[in-house]
Amino acid sequence: MYSAVNPDCRIIHGASPVTLLKAIRNEQEIAGIHAAMQRDGVALVKFLKWLEASVPTGKETEISIDKKLHEFRAEQDLYMGESFDTIAGYKEHGAIVHYEATPETDVQLKPEGFLLLDSGAQYLDGTTDITRTIALGKLTEEEKTDYTLILKGHIALAMAVFPAGTRGAQLDVLARMPIWQRRMNFLHGTGHGVGHFLNVHEGPQSIRCLLYTSPSPRD
């Protein structure tokens, strides 16, 4: 595309004016998002009911549940496909950022521990991106504690009241504070914008730490 630009044209390097326009939802987009989320929620409820009954059989794996979730979503009206490759990580795999199960890494699910499920769909009236941490059975005390700390961060962020102009990096602290107090952290973002039948990650809005390299005071 760049090479097709007429050399007589003046090229301006900067943010596209379309970016900010897309960041503000009109009434039709908001209604579409609500409708898409409702249908996606129906698919997820059906999937979770199926998962609860299927895991104890010992026949399900990370890959097989990914396929089943796709089937439930495909039943919904206006479904066009997945918005990104599903991340279904069982136990240790759930700690790998953007993990994708392969025939070599695929593991059997058991009625114990956590399953991390990060998935979404494209519908004609909206895009979804849903992450859930699902207890498949008995949990360790460490797992219970970690889950509770993350829940506290979610609640703090969801309940936040802030003035216009507040940055996502400032709000990000609210979500991380409970785990920071335990000397823990996560190195990925906390939240991001979602497109309207477009990119599942869509800026410029984002809730994440400002990660950069700076000299240490002791250097």
Where are these regions (language model features)?
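Active-site neighborhoods and metal-handling regions in enzymes and metal-associated proteins
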Residues: 1-214, 218-219
